[in-house]
């Protein structure tokens, strides 16, 4: 983790302490998953990977403070390991119809190294739950723009969710890539706050043919 990221997280923690002396409402989640492949922004990171994730959300004086750590550990000889850390602040407006988020997103890849981005997102409490996000590399003027939608249905036996993503990312100052993804997830609650799920995804970008990915995982909320 680079020094810039450490300083930003420390500053965020200081602002949280100053902003509110109230007892915070804390929620968390963790999970693990086996995935046939891991794609990030339309690019293959690794095949056959074990993934783990832990996250938190703290409500302080009307502001949500959130963080998430995700790791992808390749089990194949030609794959890369990837660690991703997200920390940010969010708030809701217009009777929770509009949500806004800002934060930092750090990726550490075993082959390409460490990269830190700032991001801003807007989400709408409308059908399909549309969200738009923009990311900017803190060292170079490289941008990523993403739009996401999702739709869920409760079938009693399982919950189904279909999610789609469309984005464009600057690979370098001279090259960009447009990518698309769609994921269908089936989730079964096996105990209070414990879910078992399976998903299948389609991943595509403008430099290759589309690929199909799948995974199975377990998630816990607390």
Regions found by a protein language model. Name each.
Residues 2-5, 13, 17-222:
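Outer-membrane beta-barrel proteins
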């Amino acid at each position: 983790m680079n020094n810039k990221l450490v300083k930003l997280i420390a500053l965020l923690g200081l602002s949280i302490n100053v902003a509110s002396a109230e007892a915070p409402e804390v929620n968390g989640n963790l999970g693990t998953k086996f995935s046939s492949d891991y794609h990030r922004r339309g690019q293959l990171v690794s095949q056959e990977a074990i993934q783990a994730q832990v996250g938190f959300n703290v409500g302080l004086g009307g502001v949500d403070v959130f963080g998430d750590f995700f790791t992808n550990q390749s089990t194949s000889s030609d794959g890369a390991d990837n660690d991703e850390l997200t920390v940010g602040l969010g708030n809701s407006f217009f009777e929770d119809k509009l949500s806004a988020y800002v934060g930092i997103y750090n990726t550490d890849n075993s082959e390409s190294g460490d990269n830190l981005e700032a991001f801003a997102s807007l989400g709408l409490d409308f059908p399909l739950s549309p969200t738009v996000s923009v990311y900017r590399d803190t060292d170079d003027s490289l941008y990523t723009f993403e739009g996401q939608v999702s739709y869920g249905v409760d079938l009693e036996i399982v919950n189904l969710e279909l999610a789609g993503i469309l984005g464009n990312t600057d690979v370098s100052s001279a090259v960009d890539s447009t990518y698309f993804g769609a994921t269908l997830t089936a989730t079964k609650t096996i105990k209070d706050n414990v879910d078992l799920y399976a998903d299948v995804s389609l991943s595509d970008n403008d430099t290759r043919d589309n690929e199909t990915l799948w995974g199975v995982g377990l998630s816990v909320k607390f």
